[in-house]
Amino acid sequence: MTTSQFKKSKLIENNSQSLEILKEKNFNDVPLDVAIEIFMRLPVKSVARFLLLSKFWAEIIRSRHFITSFQVRSSLQPRLLVVFIDLNKQWNCEDWYFFSLSSSTTSYLSRVTCPFPDYVHYSHYVNGLISHGYGLEKFITNPSTGKSTVLGRVQTNSKVAQCFLGYDPVNDEYKLLVLCMKEKMQRHDGRTRILQLSSQHQVFPLGVKKKPWRMIDYTTPHGPVLNSVCIDGVLYYVAFTGEDLSQLSLMRFDLGSEKLDLFTSLPADFPAAFLHGFTLMRYKGKVALATKTLFIGIEVWVLDQQAEIHGWLKKSFSIKGVRRWLFCDLFITGTTHTGEFILAPRFYSNSFYVIYYNPDTKSLRKTKVEVHGGYDFKHRETKAMVFPDYVETVRLL
C-alpha cells in the first residue's frame, strides 16, 4: 500500500470511528466541545446529514464560529477545484461536474445543472463558493455539496449583468458586485469593436433577504474584461476606461465599505493586443497579471501597492522540461499558496494534467486528474476550469 493510500484509508477509518461515537452515544452524553471536534473531522456531506438531528445542532453547524473553523481546517489540505462543463443541447442546459484535486487524489464532489445561457456567463470561485451568471439570473453554488441558492433577478433595463464574487474576511460576508451592461460601438485603430459598458453598479450581499440589491455611488462607465481576483476583502478586475475607452485600468471594489474606484493604470509595456491571454490573480499576496510566452515561459506583472505611486514589477521565467505542443494547450489559472504557477488545459481529455511551476526553484511537477466512471462529458469536447485554493465549506447547507 502506498503512503497516500494508507493516509486515505486512515482518514476513512477515523471518520467512521467518529460517526460510530455519535451513533452509539446519546448527544446529551457527549460534551459540546467533543461533538464539535468530531463534526470538524467529518466530510461536509456527512456534516450536512446531522442538520436533521435537531434544531440545536443545526444552529451549531450553521454558526459563524463552526463555519469559519471548518474552513480553516479544510484549508490545511491544499487542493484545487476542477470543473468540467458539459453542454446538453437536448435539454437546453449545462451540467457542471465538480472535482477536488490533491497531489495524489481526484475526488468527485457534486454535479449541478444550470440553465443554458442566452448571454455570455461568468463564474468566479471564492472561499468555498462559486458564482454563476446567466443574463440577469445569478446563483451561488457550494461545490462540496452541489447545493445552490438562486439570487433575486437584477433590477435593470439592461439585458446583461456581469458579476464578480468577493469575500470579506473581517465581516465574514460574501458579496456580488454586479455591473449592468450596455453595448457601445467604437472605432479603434481603423477597426470597429463592440464594447460592453457598465451603466449601473449594484451590490448583492449573500444572506440578506429584504431588498438585497443596493445601488453603488459610481457613475463612470467602463468596460470590464478578464476575470476578477479577491484579496483580503478587496475585489480587483481589469477594464477599459477613459473618454475613448482606450486606457486599460485596474478597478478596485472594497467589500467592506462598498466603494468602487479606478485604482491604477496597467503598466505601459503591457501588451493590450493579447489581453485575453492573461490571467488576473494573486501572486505571493499581491495583485498580478500573468501570461505565457511563445518560448515556453511565463511573464508576470506584479503590483507594488506599498510604493507612493503604484508601480508594476515585471518578472520573466523560462520553463524547462515541457514540450511545446503541451505548453500551447495550457492556460495559467492562478498560483498555489506556496507561489507555484498553476497551468491547466481548457478542455477535458483522458490525459488531463495540471502542471505546477515553482519560479523560485525552477522546478516542475504535474498531477493527473483521474476521472473514474462513465460520465457523459468524457465522450465529447467539454470545457474545463481549474481554481486554486479549494476548501470545503458548510455554507448553503
UniProtKB/Swiss-Prot annotation:
Protein's GO biological process: protein ubiquitination
Compartments in which it is found: Nucleus
GO CC field: nucleus
Sequence ranges assigned to domain F-box in this UniProt record: 24-70
Pfam (any one): FBA_3
Pathway named in the protein's UniProt entry: Protein modification; protein ubiquitination
Record keywords: Nucleus, Ubl conjugation pathway
Top-level taxon: Eukaryota
InterPro entries found in the cross-reference section: F-box-assoc_dom_typ3, F-box-assoc_interact_dom, F-box-like_dom_sf, F-box_dom
The keyword Nucleus belongs to this UniProt entry's keyword annotation: yes
Domain observations: The F-box is necessary for the interaction with ASK proteins.
Function recorded in the entry: Component of SCF(ASK-cullin-F-box) E3 ubiquitin ligase complexes, which may mediate the ubiquitination and subsequent proteasomal degradation of target proteins.
Subunit structure: Part of a SCF (ASK-cullin-F-box) protein ligase complex. Interacts with ASK16.
The protein's name: F-box protein At4g11590
Annotated organism of origin: Arabidopsis thaliana (Mouse-ear cress)
